[in-house]
Amino acid sequence: MIPIKKGAEPPELKELRQKAIEKKLSPQNAYDTLKGKRKGIVRQSLLQEQGHLCAYCMCRIPRNDVCAGIAPIRIEHYISRNPNDDRDIGQGLDYENLLAVCNGNIASSDHNHKFDDLTCDAHKKNTDLHKVNPCISETLESIFYHVDGEIDAYDPDVKTDLVEILNLNCPKSPIVSEREAALSELILNMNDFQGNDLINYCRISLKSFQDEQDNKTPYQGILIWYLKSILDKLTKSKT
């Protein structure tokens, strides 16, 4: 998971949100007014600021393996529009509360799937995350990865968010093996360098990933983490 820098609210959404406030619509009813061209504009705005990566698992969205009848991109409400405590803070059309996410490993449109096989917001549903918020970088600082592609965290609340609520290590989803494959490719490229050349390669690669805007490299979170950890080891060994 990587930090998301929210951009400006699309004017089309602002207009709709103000009307919803005037009509005192519930978060769900307010969101139901977002449709057609307006919804497409909001979706595209979210995709661009996230570099076409899922806010939670970092896969490319839309994925190219989504079954017919399944929405390849979902608009997620960080604070659910139907929260378990029924709170209403205008979250239905609050742009700061909206994220673009993948289909969450939903295999078919007939709902013939197991809950434990789902990921991201499809598994999160209306549950509040304890701490993780991709729009607040400080909440992501304890995250680390394993070379087999699994995501983890030193902070137990963050780990619960990642592993239990978002199910980002789901064995039935391709995301773990895809994270592992992305890291393996990076390590293979690093094997061509040694000493100062390796340090320079890692620094250049790290900056390249961090500077990406739209169409970011899928699963770059594990790549950035690995490059930082290797650079830390290499620079410490030289002191």
Predicted regions and their residues:
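Hydrophobic N-terminal alpha-helices or hydrophobic patches in metabolic proteins across all domains
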Residues: 50, 60-71, 165, 175-178, ...
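Catalytic cores of phosphodiester-bond-cleaving enzymes
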Residues: 3-8, 15-20, 32-33, 40, ...
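Long, low-complexity, intrinsically disordered segments enriched in glycines and aromatic residues
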Residues: 112-172
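Short Cys/His-rich metal-coordination motifs, predominantly Zn2+-binding knuckles/fingers
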Residues: 57, 105, 139
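Histidine-centered nuclease catalytic patch
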Residues: 60-121
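C-terminal, charged low-complexity interaction regions
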Residues: 156-239
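A structural signal for short, well-ordered beta-strand segments and their strand-loop junctions
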Residues: 55-56, 74, 100-101, 142-145, ...
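Short, charged surface segments at domain edges that flank catalytic/cofactor-binding sites
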Residues: 3-56, 84, 89-93
